[in-house]
């Protein structure tokens, strides 16, 4: 778990992580490889869902702008991924719902005002900036985004 989050944070793809596991097969043996894959599946990380393993990064439709009220934080499910969207007039931020600490999915219920708190280890984030404001030291993962035809799109 601890090495997985570090690998993903440093840019390793799901395919590269799986390749590394398989390369370790002669040393670790089948039982430990199966155990590691079970952990990956239990973590329910979108990158490791079978339909996403060989997918190339692409633009995904998040929502029409009129469904994202200014001054509010909206929780959306999009393309197999949960997102928090902050909109304040022309400022828009699109965040992955997974905590950067151990990739725990942060539910919508963890949002109080503009503060989002991970239920696992209580890392807290300011959704207006994405910065970690309590316990941890890494910001939320923010996705590149654009507005096209009055619709918010995000890239992953």
Segment roles from a protein language model:
Residues 138:
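Ligand-binding loop in jelly-roll beta-barrel domains
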Residues 99, 118-121:
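Short cysteine clusters
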Residues 12, 104, 123:
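Short glycine/serine/threonine/alanine-rich loop segments
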Residues 7, 121, 145:
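Hydrophobic/aromatic pocket-lining and membrane-interface residues
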């Amino acid at each position: 778990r601890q090495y997985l989050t570090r690998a993903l944070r440093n840019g390793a793809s799901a395919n590269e992580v799986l390749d590394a596991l398989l390369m370790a097969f002669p040393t670790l043996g089948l039982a430990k490889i199966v155990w590691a894959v079970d952990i990956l599946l239990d973590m329910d990380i979108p990158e490791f869902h079978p339909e996403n393993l060989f997918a190339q990064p692409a633009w995904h439709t998040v929502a029409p702008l009129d469904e994202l009220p200014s001054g509010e934080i909206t929780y959306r499910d999009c393309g197999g991924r949960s997102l928090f969207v902050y909109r304040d007039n022309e400022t828009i931020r699109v965040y992955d719902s997974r905590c950067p600490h151990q990739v725990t999915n942060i539910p919508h219920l963890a949002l109080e005002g503009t503060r989002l708190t991970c239920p696992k280890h209580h890392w807290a984030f300011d959704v207006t900036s994405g910065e970690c404001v309590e316990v941890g030291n890494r910001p939320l993962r923010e996705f590149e985004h654009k507005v096209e035809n009055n619709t918010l799109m995000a890239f992953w």
